């Protein structure tokens, strides 16, 4: 569960290392974001010569959460850290060309097939 002020790692090669959630999209009273939800983020730490710079405000999709994802068969998939993939402002496609770490199958339902195809492992 990601909410405002939550810090996340970045799971792509866009140049950002850590980001802060500043808004959960999807309604005025929406409080939490889970895997597959889009959030508005601010870049807090970035590497030199990356595609994004510190202080930029962009959209991102959550790909891993510590809270986990509950499947219809009752199993729960949990991760050690919260992570997101940064999206392009206009097309909502990933900025990076590589995804690091596993992602969940729930992204397929949310129409993020590009992230699924770039990921090294889909759980």
UniProtKB/Swiss-Prot annotation:
Any one GO molecular-function label of the UniProt entry: structural constituent of ribosome
GO BP terms in the entry: translation
Pfam families, sorted: Ribosomal_L14
Source taxon at top rank: Bacteria
GO cellular component, one term: cytosolic large ribosomal subunit
Keywords in alphabetical order: Ribonucleoprotein, Ribosomal protein, RNA-binding, rRNA-binding
CDD domains assigned: Ribosomal_uL14
InterPro entries from the UniProt entry: Ribosomal_uL14, Ribosomal_uL14_bac-type, Ribosomal_uL14_CS, Ribosomal_uL14_sf
HAMAP family: Ribosomal_uL14 (MF_01367)
Subunit structure: Part of the 50S ribosomal subunit. Forms a cluster with proteins L3 and L19. In the 70S ribosome, L14 and L19 interact and together make contacts with the 16S rRNA in bridges B5 and B8.
Family, as annotated: Belongs to the universal ribosomal protein uL14 family.
Role according to the record: Binds to 23S rRNA. Forms part of two intersubunit bridges in the 70S ribosome.
Name listed for the protein in its UniProt record: Large ribosomal subunit protein uL14
GN (gene name): rplN
């Amino acid at each position: 569960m990601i909410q405002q002020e939550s810090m996340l790692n970045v799971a792509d090669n866009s140049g950002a290392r850590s980001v802060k959630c500043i808004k959960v999209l999807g309604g005025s009273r929406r409080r939490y974001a889970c895997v597959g939800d889009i959030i508005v983020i601010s870049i807090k730490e970035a590497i030199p010569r990356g595609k994004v710079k510190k202080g930029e405000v962009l959209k991102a999709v959550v790909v891993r959460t510590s809270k986990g994802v509950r499947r219809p068969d009752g199993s729960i998939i949990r991760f050690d850290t919260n992570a997101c993939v940064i999206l392009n402002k206009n097309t909502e496609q990933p900025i990076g060309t590589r995804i690091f770490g596993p992602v969940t199958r729930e992204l397929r339902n949310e129409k993020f097939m590009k992230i699924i195809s770039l990921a090294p492992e889909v759980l």
